[in-house]
């Protein structure tokens, strides 16, 4: 039971709702369509959670072995930092969750496309592999992109674009402008969450050479950057919502 609690701590359960936000929005856009699949929707939720757990394990591992998670770090203590799991055990956890995520992703892809289009199958399998790489490479490796100020871009891409547009396309086999705008909105909200965490960790990140966007910008500009992200996210989200209301009443009246 104690070991299970340690793995739950490493999985960072409070981060999981954010990981499924794009999936929820992408599928919500498809709910009124006759070919909407609840099976595909549930699979997408499990896949998104799996990718987030991979990222959390890898984040713990990468920051731990680089010394970023040290006694000066503000925020919750990590399992590797506390010695609750060894590097080897945590690495095995990353490998295991990567296999789980890829198996679930392949199941989703073949259920969604069957033999309709091998091009779509190949593209989405490639995207799944890339997603695993991105989840791990944020902090792991000599060229970890989270240490080069690229974390914000990847969060926008995966939490927004891949999550919302991927969910929408898997359900309907097409794309739309509302889906694109909402993908940007969810992406900006997600980058905002990352930015808040990086603002909290700014001093320690700068000291250990982790060049996040906040470290590049400085505290004052990072706050302005955060306001811009939130304003854009809200405008896009509300804009899509209001346009749908206008279309609804215009159609019925």
Residue ranges and their predicted role:
Residues 25, 33-58, 123-136, 176-196:
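Membrane-embedded alpha-helical segments that form the functional core of polytopic membrane enzymes
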Residues 1-39, 43, 47, 138-146, ...:
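Topogenic membrane-insertion module of multi-pass membrane proteins
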Residues 50-74, 191-214:
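Acidic (Asp/Glu-rich) catalytic motifs at the cytosolic membrane interface
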Residues 72-114, 210-245:
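Multi-pass membrane catalytic core of lipid/isoprenoid biosynthesis enzymes
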Residues 2-4, 56-59, 79, 133-146, ...:
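C-terminal ends of transmembrane helices
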Residues 183-200, 204, 217-253:
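C-terminal membrane-associated helical module and adjoining short loops/tails
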Residues 76-78, 82-174:
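Intramembrane alpha-helical segments
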Residues 155-202:
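Functional transmembrane core segments of multi-pass inner-membrane proteins
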């Amino acid at each position: 039971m104690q070991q299970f609690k340690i793995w739950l701590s490493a999985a960072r359960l409070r981060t999981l709702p954010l990981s499924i936000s794009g999936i929820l929005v992408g599928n919500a856009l498809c709910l009124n369509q006759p070919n909407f699949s609840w099976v595909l929707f549930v699979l997408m939720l499990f896949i998104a959670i799996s990718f987030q757990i991979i990222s959390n394990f890898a984040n713990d591992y990468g920051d731990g072995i680089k010394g970023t998670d040290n006694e000066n770090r503000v925020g919750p203590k990590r399992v590797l930092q506390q010695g609750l799991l060894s590097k080897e055990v945590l690495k095995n956890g990353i490998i295991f969750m990567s296999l789980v995520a890829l198996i679930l992703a392949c199941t989703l892809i073949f259920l969604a496309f069957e033999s309709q289009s091998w091009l779509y199958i190949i593209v989405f399998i490639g995207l799944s592999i890339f997603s695993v790489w991105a989840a791990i490479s944020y902090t792991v490796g000599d060229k970890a992109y989270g240490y080069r100020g690229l974390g914000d871009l990847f969060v926008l891409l995966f939490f927004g674009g891949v999550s919302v547009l991927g969910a929408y396309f898997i359900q309907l086999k097409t794309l739309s402008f509302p889906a694109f705008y909402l993908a940007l909105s969810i992406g900006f909200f997600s980058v905002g969450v990352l930015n808040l965490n990086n603002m909290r960790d700014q001093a320690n990140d700068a000291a250990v050479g982790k060049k996040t966007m906040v470290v590049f910008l400085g505290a004052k500009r990072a706050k302005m950057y955060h306001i811009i992200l939130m304003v854009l996210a809200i405008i896009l989200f509300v804009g899509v919502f209001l346009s749908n209301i206008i279309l609804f009443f215009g159609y019925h009246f």
